[in-house]
C-alpha cells in the first residue's frame, strides 16, 4: 500500500525526503504518536548492514519492512537500558531517529556547500590580484563559519586544496576546455612518438572594428588556465567513453602538466595585425591541448578592451567625458567584459560582482521601474532625493522636458532642507541631442551647472561621435550592449563580435635536436615560420617582426616579456589591474592619432625582417609549394 505524503516518509540511500511534523508537540498530538515520550527515549540500531530502503506505513499503525529492509533486529531501550515493548513507542522512536539523522545530513550538506562557496570566492579573488597577495593562511580560513564548523581532519589548509575544491565545482573543467580534435591530435602524436618541442604563435590577421590596433588583454586569465590545466579522474573516464583511447595514453593525460615556456605582450600593450600576442614553446601534446583555452581567453578580453578604448576615445571629442560600462545584462562573460573595459579606459562598472572581484569603481543610476512605482514623477524624484546625499534622476520615463522642471524643483528643495545634491540626470531614449541641449539650458538657468547629463541607450563609438558632432550637451555616457558583445556596426558594414586570433605551429625540434621551420601555405592565411621577437620604433614609426636570433634593431624596444618558464610563473610578470590600466592609457596616448581613429586610411607599418622572409621561402620549399602572396 502506498504511504500518504502527509503522514509517511520514504528513505532512500542517497535521497532523503522526510515530511515530518514541525515539532515534537505536534507529533505527540497526532493519533499515531499517543503514548510516546519522544524527548526521553531513543532507538539503538544494532544492524551493521549498509543503509537500505525503509518504509513506514502509518495507516497500518505499524512498521512495515520492504524486501530490502535489514533482517537484523533493532533493540529499543529506555535511557536506563529497559527494552521498549510498545510498537507505537518503537515506531515513534524510529521516526525520531530518522528525523535526527536527516537533520544531521542536511547540516553536513550545508557545510560542504559553504566550504565550496568559500573556496570558489577565495579562488576568484586570488585570480584577479597580484601574485604577491595570493596567500591564504589558516587564520584567514578560520574566519569562515563553514570552515570553523568542519571536523579538524576536513579543514582546508592550503590554497592548492581550495583550488582543488573549486575545480570540482560544476562547469570548471580546464582539461576539457578544448575542442574534440585537440585530444585526438594528442593521441596521434602519442601513437607516433612525435612529441618534440614545438613553438606556436598566437596572433590575429586583422584589427577589429575597421581600426588599426588591438589593446591586449586576457593574459592573466590565460595564465591561470595554463596553471590549472589538468585532467581529473572523472574527466579521464569521460574521455575513455567518447573515444577508444589506449589506457596508457589516458594515464599520460592524467598526469599531464604544462612544463614549457611562454612569452607574451603584457596586458595593456598595443599590438597590430600579424604580430604574435603570445609565443608558446612546449612538447607538442602540452602545447596543442592549450590552444582553444588560450584563444578563448585572449580573443574575448582583447576584443572588449579594444572596443572600450575606441568608445572612450570617441567620447573625448572637445573635452574629457567619462564612460561607464553597463554591459552586464547583455554580456556573454560579464566579469571579463568589466575587467577588459576598465583596461580600455571605462571609469566604472554597473556590475557589483565585478566591482567586488576587481576592486573597480561601481556606478548606477535609476531604472524606469522605480519611477513608475510612485503615483507621480515628482513623488519618485522626491523619494530618491531624500534617500541619498548625491543622487541621479532618470528623465525620460514620460516626458524629459517636463521631468527636468520637476527635477530642478526637487533638487533645489532638498538641497535647501537636507543638503542633498543632484549629481546627474540621465537620458536613455528620445531625441538625445535636442533634449540634452534643452536640459542643459534649464539646469544652468537654475544655478545647477554642476549637474552632469548622462546619455545611454544602445550607444557605441560611432553613435557617440554622431551625438557629439550634432552638438549634444552630454557630459558622460553609459554603454552596454555594444561593449558587452564587442559588436561592430551593421549600418556601416563594419564587422565585430569576435577577434579571430589563431594559434599556429611555427617551429619544431625532434628527439635528435634537429630543428624544422613549420609553415602553412594557404594564400592570405599563409604563416611565417620560426621563433620570433617583436621590436617597436621609439617614435612608433614601425614595428619589426624578426627571428629570435637576429640582432635587435638599434634603439627599438622589445615587446615580448617572459611570463612562464619550465611551467612556472615568472614573478612580477602579471602586474595588478591598476598598473595594467595605467600602461594601456599610456600606450594609447603614445599611439599616433591617425592610427587611433575609428576608421583608418592605412594600416600601421609592420615589417618582416629579411631573415624571416627567407625562412618562409625555405620552409615552403620543404613542402614543395611556393608561397602564394
How would you label these PLM feature ranges?
Residues 151-196, 200, 209-212, 444-446, ...:
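Gly/Ser/Thr/Ala-enriched C-terminal appendages of enzymes
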Residues 3, 7-12, 29, 36, ...:
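Short, intrinsically disordered low-complexity segments enriched in Ser/Thr with adjacent Pro
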Residues 18, 33-34, 38, 59-62, ...:
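Short hydrophobic targeting helices and cationic amphipathic motifs
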Residues 198-254:
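N-terminal, Lys/Arg-enriched amphipathic/low-complexity engagement segments
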Amino acid at each position: 500500500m502506498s504511504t500518504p505524503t502527509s503522514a509517511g516518509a520514504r528513505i532512500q540511500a542517497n535521497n532523503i525526503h522526510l515530511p515530518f511534523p514541525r515539532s515534537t508537540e505536534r507529533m505527540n498530538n497526532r493519533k499515531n504518536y499517543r503514548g510516546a515520550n519522544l524527548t526521553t527515549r531513543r532507538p539503538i540500531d544494532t544492524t551493521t548492514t549498509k543503509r537500505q530502503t525503509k518504509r513506514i506505513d502509518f495507516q497500518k499503525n505499524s512498521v512495515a519492512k520492504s524486501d530490502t529492509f535489514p533482517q537484523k533486529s533493532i533493540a529499543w531501550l529506555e535511557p536506563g537500558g529497559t527494552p521498549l515493548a510498545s510498537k507505537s513507542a518503537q515506531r515513534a522512536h524510529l521516526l525520531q531517529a530518522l528525523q535526527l539523522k536527516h537533520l544531521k545530513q542536511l547540516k553536513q550538506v550545508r557545510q560542504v556547500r559553504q566550504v565550496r562557496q568559500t573556496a570558489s570566492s577565495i579562488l576568484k579573488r586570488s585570480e584577479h590580484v597580484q601574485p604577491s597577495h595570493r596567500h591564504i593562511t589558516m587564520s584567514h580560513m578560520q574566519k569562515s563559519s563553514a570552515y570553523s564548523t568542519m571536523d579538524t581532519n576536513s579543514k582546508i589548509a592550503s590554497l592548492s586544496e581550495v583550488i582543488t575544491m573549486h575545480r570540482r565545482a560544476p562547469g570548471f573543467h580546464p582539461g576539457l576546455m578544448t575542442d574534440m580534435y585537440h585530444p585526438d591530435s594528442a593521441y596521434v602524436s602519442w601513437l607516433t612518438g612525435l612529441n618534440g618541442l614545438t613553438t606556436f604563435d598566437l596572433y590575429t590577421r586583422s584589427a577589429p572594428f575597421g581600426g588599426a590596433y588591438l589593446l591586449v588583454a586576457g593574459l592573466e586569465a590565460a595564465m591561470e588556465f595554463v596553471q590549472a590545466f589538468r585532467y581529473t579522474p572523472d574527466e579521464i573516464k569521460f574521455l575513455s567513453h567518447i573515444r577508444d583511447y589506449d589506457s596508457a595514453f589516458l594515464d599520460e593525460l592524467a598526469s599531464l602538466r604544462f612544463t614549457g615556456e611562454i612569452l607574451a605582450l603584457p596586458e595593456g600593450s598595443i599590438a597590430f595585425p600579424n604580430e604574435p600576442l603570445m609565443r608558446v614553446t612546449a612538447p607538442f601534446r602540452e602545447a596543442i591541448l592549450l590552444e582553444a583555452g588560450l584563444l578563448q581567453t585572449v580573443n574575448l578580453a582583447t576584443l572588449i578592451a579594444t572596443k572600450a578604448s575606441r568608445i572612450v576615445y570617441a567620447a573625448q571629442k572637445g573635452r574629457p567625458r567619462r564612460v561607464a560600462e553597463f554591459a552586464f545584462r547583455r554580456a556573454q562573460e560579464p566579469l571579463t567584459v568589466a575587467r577588459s573595459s576598465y583596461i580600455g579606459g571605462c571609469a566604472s562598472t554597473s556590475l557589483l560582482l565585478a566591482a567586488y572581484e576587481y576592486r573597480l569603481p561601481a556606478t548606477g543610476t535609476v531604472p524606469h521601474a522605480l519611477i513608475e512605482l510612485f503615483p507621480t514623477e515628482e513623488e519618485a524624484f522626491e523619494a530618491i532625493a531624500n534617500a541619498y546625499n548625491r543622487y541621479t534622476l532618470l528623465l525620460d520615463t514620460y516626458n524629459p522636458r517636463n521631468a527636468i522642471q520637476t527635477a530642478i524643483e526637487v533638487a533645489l528643495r532638498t538641497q535647501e532642507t537636507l543638503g542633498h545634491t543632484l549629481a546627474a540626470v540621465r537620458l536613455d531614449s528620445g531625441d538625445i541631442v535636442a533634449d540634452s541641449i534643452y536640459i542643459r539650458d534649464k539646469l544652468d538657468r537654475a544655478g545647477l551647472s554642476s549637474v552632469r547629463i548622462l546619455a545611454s541607450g544602445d550607444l557605441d563609438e560611432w553613435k557617440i561621435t554622431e551625438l557629439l558632432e550634432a552638438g549634444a550637451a552630454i557630459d558622460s555616457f553609459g554603454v552596454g550592449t555594444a561593449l558587452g558583445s564587442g559588436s561592430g556596426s551593421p549600418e556601416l558594414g563594419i564587422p565585430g563580435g569576435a577577434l579571430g586570433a589563431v594559434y599556429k605551429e611555427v617551429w619544431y625540434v625532434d628527439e635528435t635536436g634537429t630543428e624544422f621551420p613549420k609553415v602553412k601555405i594557404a594564400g592570405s592565411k599563409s604563416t611565417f615560420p620560426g621563433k620570433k621577437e617583436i621590436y617597436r620604433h621609439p617614435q612608433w614609426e614601425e614595428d619589426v617582426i624578426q627571428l629570435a636570433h637576429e640582432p635587435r634593431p638599434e634603439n627599438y624596444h622589445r615587446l615580448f616579456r617572459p611570463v612562464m618558464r619550465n611551467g612556472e610563473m615568472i614573478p612580477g610578470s602579471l602586474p595588478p589591474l591598476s598598473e595594467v590600466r595605467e600602461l594601456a592609457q599610456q600606450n594609447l596616448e603614445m599611439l599616433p592619432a591617425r592610427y587611433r581613429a575609428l576608421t583608418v586610411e592605412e594600416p600601421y607599418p609592420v615589417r618582416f625582417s629579411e631573415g624571416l622572409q627567407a625562412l618562409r621561402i625555405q620552409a615552403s620549399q620543404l613542402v614543395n609549394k611556393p608561397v602564394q602572396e
